[in-house]
Amino acid sequence: MGDPKRHRKKYTTPTHPWDKARLEKEMQLVIKYGLRNKRELWRFQNILRKYRRVARDLLAEIGLPGKEGEIAKAKAQTVIKKLNKMGILPENATLDDILNLSVEDFLERRLQTMVYRQGLARTIKQARQFITHGHIAVDGRRVTSPSFIVTKELESKISFYRNSPLAKTEVV
């Protein structure tokens, strides 16, 4: 089976644990997107933080003369293309658009949110239950992770799993 090298947290906790404004905002997001706990939210905040850091660094490097500037432009196009493929940025986006992203842009691309928005479940909590119980498939493959990031090309391929009893009945 093998030994895992190192387990690292995929999130960072807030620096001030009892900031009232942050706690209220986080609670609203947890309720709106049906998250199980705030660690799920912090994970997506960390992903956003990484993309914003990359965008800031690339904006600084693009201004450099010579080959460094050209390499930075190519890296910028790669990052923008990746976020576009995920469905977070539009086709003609720039690095400034990455800096304007919010954590809600990433939370909207979760499978749980997509199942609810497409009407396969009545509530966001029911969408999570359908996914964890194995009733939802993406491109014909069963996905049991509510935090699965749905790309633009897979967005139209979300459906009930073919062997699921829910596929044979009308849920909504």
UniProtKB/Swiss-Prot annotation:
InterPro entries in alphabetical order: Ribosomal_uS4, Ribosomal_uS4_arc, Ribosomal_uS4_CS, Ribosomal_uS4_euk/arc, Ribosomal_uS4_N, S4_RNA-bd, S4_RNA-bd_sf
GO terms assigned for molecular function: rRNA binding; structural constituent of ribosome
Entry superkingdom: Archaea
GO terms (BP aspect): ribosomal small subunit biogenesis; translation
Classification via Pfam families: Ribosomal_S4, S4
Keywords, alphabetical: Ribonucleoprotein, Ribosomal protein, RNA-binding, rRNA-binding
Stretches that traverse the bilayer: none
Residue runs in coiled coils: none
Stretches assigned to the S4 RNA-binding domain: 109-165
GO CC annotation terms, alphabetical: small ribosomal subunit
Protein family membership: Belongs to the universal ribosomal protein uS4 family.
Subunit-structure text: Part of the 30S ribosomal subunit. Contacts protein S5. The interaction surface between S4 and S5 is involved in control of translational fidelity.
Role played: One of the primary rRNA binding proteins, it binds directly to 16S rRNA where it nucleates assembly of the body of the 30S subunit. With S5 and S12 plays an important role in translational accuracy.
Protein name (Swiss-Prot/TrEMBL): Small ribosomal subunit protein uS4
Gene source species: Archaeoglobus fulgidus (strain ATCC 49558 / DSM 4304 / JCM 9628 / NBRC 100126 / VC-16)
